[in-house]
Amino acid sequence: MAASGGQKSEKLDEAQALARSCAGRPDFLPCDGLSICATHSHGKCFKLHWCCHLGWCHCKYVYQPMTSVCQLPSTAVPVAPSGHTHTMNLSISLAERFLRTAPKFQAPPCPESPKFCVISDLFVDDYMVKRINGKMCYVQRPPPPTPNPTHQPQTAAPQPVPQRSKNSHQVGPTVKQGQAKEKISAPKMDHCSSPSSSEDSGINALGLHYMESCDEDSCVDDDDEEEEDDELSTDGNSSPGSFWDQDECTLLSPSKSIVEIIEKIETTV
């Protein structure tokens, strides 16, 4: 309690000292109790103002009141523009320009209707299911000759594709070379078709027939596979050369393709 009383007495003494110092100034003005006290001290931009502090009047620096706008020097604004002026009314000028150029405005052209592709044209769907060494494989059929080719790019030169026989797991095999070499051209590629270079499609990256899409591990001679070959080879249209005689067939999907069997062209000793 004694400490708090001592602090109050110190503040009171300070306020009295400020009041005495301010009262002796020649510009002393009594405090009206309504002015806001300020603690700024920015030199000539401020004037002295008397305020109350702990019941005693003392002086403080406050902001100098702003000069009224009416008292500031100003340039006389003419009532009407003179004849020699370089100004213009932008709104009127833009409106007149728009009215002059409005008849020349044209609506944007209507965009062309989108061209749709048939979903079946996006896939090379001329495959045949063939049985090679006991394994069913997809082999692409050579494209039929078109009488009037349209939008056909320049095709590559025809390349002969010899058929190689599987000669694994044999000591002295004698391979039959009865199958003739056939020259085929690359398939037709237009804007709707997409070339396939994967091994699953049965063609290589050049669009030729992929004759080695089957694994060589599946060429093991089993009695069951020989019996199936004998049963399936009873069909009259199962000769090795019958595959090349079907150039006039239409394009078929793998679900509607022709099942053809290639008999083993290897002999065992």
Curated annotation (Swiss-Prot):
Q: Where is the composition biased (Pro residues)?
A: 141-150
Biased composition range(s): Acidic residues: 215-233
The GO biological-process annotations, alphabetized, read as:
circadian behavior; nervous system development
Looking up InterPro entries in the UniProt record yields:
UPF0524_fam
| Extent of Low complexity compositional bias | 151-164
Result of knocking out the encoding gene: Double knockout of c3orf70a and c3orf70b resulted in significantly decreased expression of the mature neuron markers elavl3 and eno2 and the midbrain/hindbrain marker irx3b. Neurobehaviors related to circadian rhythm and altered light-dark conditions were significantly impaired.
Which residues fall in a compositionally biased region of kind Basic and acidic residues?
Answer: 179-191
Which intervals of the chain are annotated as region Disordered? 139-203, 215-249
Key words of the record: Neurogenesis
Q: Name one Pfam family in it.
A: UPF0524
Q: What does this protein do?
A: Plays a role in neuronal and neurobehavioral development. Required for normal expression of neuronal markers elavl3 and eno2 and neurobehaviors related to circadian rhythm and changes in light-dark conditions.
Give the protein family.
Belongs to the UPF0524 family.
The protein's name in its UniProt record = UPF0524 protein C3orf70 homolog A
